[in-house]
Regions:
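P-loop/Walker A NTP-binding region and its immediately flanking N-terminal helices
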Residues: 1-174, 181-184, 190-194, 202-203
Length: 206
């Protein structure tokens, strides 16, 4: 059991290309980076397990990559990518709103937003389960979302878009993630099985 890693973490996508079942969406995100047409706020919506947080992390890393590949992926070699991969990046911050949903939590985040990045162009703030923020926390966050510093990008993720205030929705580019199809799920299971040296019949995977 030593060094055991849960498969969901071991095979979590780390590039746009490896994201399962969201090709149109990841292509749009890559194009936004390539053309330097980045919004200050994004809202990733969809059911659990479709890749919202994973895509947010890949997007955040690629935004700050100093030498993106010709395919629009992060290089994983520059200081910004290395810092992210080693979980020591000061430019990418994550907040789980399910357990950090108070006004004080948001005010602390707003204070961080004011400080420009030391490396790279942007500081990216990923707020997961954003619908869990209290009404007062949403209101405290709204002004920053209305007038963000040029170096700040927010990526909000939610399973319940209908709970987000209209004033927040109107300031975000909204991306609706698809449910992952049976075909894509089976193909990914086959890939994982092959990597693990497991022989699996197609009927078993399906």
């Amino acid at each position: 059991m030593e060094n055991y890693i849960v498969s969901a973490r071991k095979y979590r996508p780390s590039t746009f290309e490896s994201v399962v079942g969201q090709h149109a969406l990841t292509t749009t995100l890559k194009n936004a980076i390539a053309t330097n047409k980045l919004a200050h706020a994004y809202l990733f919506c969809g059911p659990r397990g479709v890749g919202k947080t994973t895509c947010a992390r890949i997007f955040a890393k690629t935004i700050n990559c100093m030498s993106p590949t010709a395919e629009g992926e992060a290089c994983n070699q520059c200081e910004s990518c290395t810092a992210f991969n080693e979980q020591r990046s000061y430019n990418i911050h994550e907040l789980d709103a399910a357990s950090n949903n108070s006004v004080d939590d948001i005010r602390q985040l707003v204070e961080q937003v004011r400080i420009p990045p030391q490396i790279g162009k942007y500081k990216v703030y990923i707020i997961d389960e954003v619908h869990m923020l209290s009404a007062s926390a949403f209101n405290a966050f709204l002004k920053t979302l209305e007038e963000p510093p040029r170096h700040a990008i927010f990526i909000l993720a939610t399973t319940e878009k209908h709970k987000i205030l209209p004033t927040i929705l109107s300031r975000c580019q909204i991306y609706d993630f698809n449910r992952i199809s049976v075909e894509d799920t089976v193909a990914h299971l086959a890939y994982v099985a092959s990597k693990e040296g497991i022989t699996a019949e197609p009927e078993a995977l399906n």
